[in-house]
């Protein structure tokens, strides 16, 4: 039996949170938000360290857009911009030797080009980081010699997660739940297929799972498999997590993430129906964005309502009841934008009590 760590037990053990989800679902952004909200944010040295990564994101963005123009049959809006296109392509995927004035001038020229913008609008047809538009719109700021990344810049900086990351922080416990301070350990593991074999290393003793879904990815494919839809992969992965016998005792909270990008994509004409035909029969209320987000939520709710297909270990079977044989298990859903600190603060406050209640209920206290 696991204790959740309250004073009444004579010790204060950490509540362990595990972030799960496919690649680029926003898990690492949540880790950064916890640092902002609970560990005094980023130091000067950490901000300086991010400058290079952010400029690498700029190059990755413009290079990926430009190199996909020919395969998509898109020409430059102006032929006079061809030298800038050639310059970026010659830099290759690794970027230029130096991020100097010449480099940023070429990026600026291309980002203003109508053909480049058209290719950007079709970015669901190739791989492009979510923060491409954000950083390319800020070229004038990012090229300055005295540029210092803001929290917003760092939150949007994309670096692939490899292995296991851990962050520790403390949170005040509501007076209604005995008060005091609670330690939290949050684990982030890489979400791409090649990283998932490492997940089992952190399953032991997990109190709650935050499963992140990139809702705006409904029309995109995986980086590691161009034949698989990202949202369909998330649904499959979520079902595996939901049915895993190693995680039966962990509370489960689903973050339907990237709502800002989802809304923007829908408002620009993107439709989930082309990839999920069952959406055409969806009768939910509201405008197209609300209907789309609620439809995605319902697909994940449907997973939780399926009968568990994997047998429980004999030693645990007597502890779980659902209908005739399966455990009743709640799953909570939140619409989130992981890059929005105020949104994450609100959601964490709401989920904090859920997590504590779940931990207490596991030991029969609440």
Residue ranges and their predicted role:
Residues 1-9:
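PEST-like, low-complexity acidic/proline-rich intrinsically disordered segments
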Residues 8-11, 37-250, 258-329, 339-344, ...:
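Switch- and interface-adjacent substructures of P-loop NTPase systems
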Residues 16-38:
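Glycine-rich phosphate-binding P-loop
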Residues 17, 331-335:
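Conserved beta-strand scaffold positions in the cores of enzyme catalytic domains, especially
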Residues 21, 26-27, 338-355:
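Conserved GTPase G-domain signal focused on the G5
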Residues 255, 326, 335-336, 348:
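TerminUS-proximal long segments
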């Amino acid at each position: 039996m696991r204790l959740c760590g309250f004073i009444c037990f004579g010790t204060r053990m950490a509540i362990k949170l595990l972030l799960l989800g496919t690649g680029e679902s926003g898990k690492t952004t949540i880790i950064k938000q916890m640092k902002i909200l609970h560990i005094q944010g980023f130091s000067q040295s950490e901000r300086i360290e991010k400058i290079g990564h952010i400029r690498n994101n700029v190059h990755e963005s413009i290079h990926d857009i430009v190199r996909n123009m020919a395969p998509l049959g898109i020409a430059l809006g102006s032929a006079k911009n061809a030298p800038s296109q050639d310059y970026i392509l010659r830099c290759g995927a690794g970027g230029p030797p130096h991020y100097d004035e010449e480099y940023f001038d070429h990026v600026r020229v291309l980002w203003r080009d109508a053909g480049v913008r058209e290719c950007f609008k079709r970015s669901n047809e190739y791989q492009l980081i979510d923060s491409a538009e954000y950083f390319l719109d800020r070229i004038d700021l990012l090229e300055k010699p005295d540029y210092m990344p803001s929290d917003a810049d760092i939150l949007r900086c994309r670096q692939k997660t490899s292995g296991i990351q851990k962050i520790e922080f403390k949170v005040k416990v509501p007076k209604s739940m005995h008060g005091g301070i609670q330690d939290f350990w949050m684990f982030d593991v890489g979400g791409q297929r090649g990283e998932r074999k490492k997940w089992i290393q952190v399953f032991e003793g997990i109190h709650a799972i935050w499963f992140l879904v990139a809702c705006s990815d409904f029309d995109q494919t995986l980086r590691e498999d161009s034949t698989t839809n990202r949202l369909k992969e998330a649904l499959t992965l979520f079902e595996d997590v939901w049915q895993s016998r190693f995680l039966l005792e962990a509370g489960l909270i689903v973050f339907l993430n990237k709502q800002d990008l989802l809304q923007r994509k829908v408002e620009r004409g993107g439709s989930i129906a082309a990839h999920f035909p069952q959406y055409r029969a969806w009768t939910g209320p509201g405008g197209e964005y609300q209907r789309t987000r609620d439809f995605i939520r319902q697909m994940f709710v449907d997973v939780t309502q399926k009968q568990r297909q994997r047998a429980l270990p004999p030693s645990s079977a007597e502890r779980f009841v659902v209908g005739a044989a399966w455990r009743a298990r709640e799953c909570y859903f939140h619409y989130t934008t992981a890059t929005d600190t105020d949104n994450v603060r609100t959601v964490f406050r709401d989920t904090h009590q859920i997590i504590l209640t779940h931990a207490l209920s596991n030991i029969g206290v609440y």
